[in-house]
């Protein structure tokens, strides 16, 4: 690389953001960190700014931004500090940025992701919720603006790697008959159904293979993570929901498979470490080191696969239903899930009731066509209001 490319890391203090910085630190000739963005973790972002010396630091929370501004001024940093969601979107589309790591969890990352796409950036998409909520709008804008999307989710990144040479998400996946997403099964893969009601947030977040944030860890435990990934796969790779399968694979070594019309099946294997898909996306179409230890298949010995249990984990079927319905249904599903998961983490809702809340929201709110971003945001807000009302003590829903 002659001149390092400007990189914006939105969600830099989260798990994906921190892993991205680890990989980037190995390759200063490839990337210069131009923007660091987060919600309110100002102490963490200040430490990152001291090390990587970005042009701009953005914190959505105004108080956190003020704290960061003072701390960086005191240490002599020249980084500008701005606040608010609009500043985050502006940073994602700035002239000093060529590549955007979109890693802000949940609906909060939607506007900045859309801004990066609109500005024709290469977007490394770790925020699956943005695609689930506004997938048709997002992918249409990718094609219109000439942006590039490279998925960071280990499963979708694996599919991307197994696609024909030169393929980019949004293109027609010619010759592909099926993609298979693998799931570890989460911490409750072997748990008795009756025991799931009383599991704690800490138990749900104790993933057997991956180190992740708490929200995505709960999604993995309910298998909603895989449900969102089904929707994501239909949008990224232009496949109907019926051509996206799920297999439970406890070893988390095979990250996904792609089946072709001639009967061939290609799989991508690797250690369960997010630095691998991050490095692949950062270097694409080349390759560089991720810092991840090589996979020892002889040591692993066996690879097992089994179908998911839809009775114990109903979130998968709820997500498939939303994928088939289209329109605002995925946004309703995502919003209800975010509210229910947070209520579970706050100990206001039991584990098995997460799916119940989502189901009730989908039953009560009709899906409608998506013609503009406002349609998605209105559906998101309505689903959040209803989910909160259902969870509220005295609602009678869980009596």
Q: Positions of the model-derived regions?
A:
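Catalytic, metal-anchored helix/loop core of enzyme active sites in primary metabolism
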Residues: 1-399
């Amino acid at each position: 690389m002659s001149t390092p490319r400007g990189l914006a890391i939105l969600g830099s203090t989260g798990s994906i953001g921190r892993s991205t910085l680890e990989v980037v630190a190995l390759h200063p000739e490839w990337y210069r960190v131009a923007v660091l963005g987060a919600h309110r973790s100002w102490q963490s972002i200040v430490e990152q700014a001291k090390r990587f010396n970005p042009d701009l630091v953005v914190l959505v929370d105004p108080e956190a931004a003020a704290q960061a501004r003072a701390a960086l001024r005191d240490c002599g940093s020249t980084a500008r500090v701005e606040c608010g969601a609009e500043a985050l979107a502006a940073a994602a589309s700035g002239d000093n940025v060529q590549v955007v790591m979109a890693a802000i969890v949940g609906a909060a990352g939607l506007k900045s992701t859309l801004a990066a796409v609109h500005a024709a950036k290469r977007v490394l998409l770790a925020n699956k919720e943005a695609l689930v909520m506004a997938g048709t709008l997002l992918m249409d804008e990718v094609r219109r603006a000439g942006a590039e999307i490279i998925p960071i989710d280990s499963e979708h990144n694996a599919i991307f790697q197994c696609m024909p040479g030169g393929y980019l998400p949004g293109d027609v996946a010619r010759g592909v008959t099926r993609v298979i997403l693998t799931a570890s099964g989460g911490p409750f893969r072997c748990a008795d159904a009756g025991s799931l009601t009383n599991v704690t947030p800490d138990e749900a977040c104790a993933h057997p293979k991956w180190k992740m944030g708490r929200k995505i860890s709960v999604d993995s435990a309910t298998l909603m993570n895989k449900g969102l990934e089904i929707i994501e796969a239909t949008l990224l790779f232009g496949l109907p929901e019926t051509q996206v399968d799920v297999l439970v694979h406890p070893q988390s070594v095979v990250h996904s498979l792609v089946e072709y019309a001639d009967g061939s099946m290609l799989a991508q294997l690797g250690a369960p470490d997010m630095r691998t898909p991050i490095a692949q996306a950062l270097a694409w179409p080349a390759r560089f080191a991720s810092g991840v230890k090589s996979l020892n298949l002889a040591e692993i010995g066996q690879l097992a696969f089994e179908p998911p249990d839809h009775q114990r984990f109903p979130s998968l079927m709820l997500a498939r239903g939303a994928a088939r319905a289209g329109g605002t249904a995925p946004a309703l599903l995502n919003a209800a899930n975010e509210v229910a998961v947070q209520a579970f983490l706050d100990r206001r809702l039991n584990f098995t009731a997460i799916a119940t809340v989502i189901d009730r929201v989908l039953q009560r709110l009709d899906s409608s066509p998506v013609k503009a971003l406002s349609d998605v945001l209105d559906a998101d807000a309505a689903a959040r209001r209803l989910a909160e009302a259902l969870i509220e003590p005295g609602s009678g829903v869980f009596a």
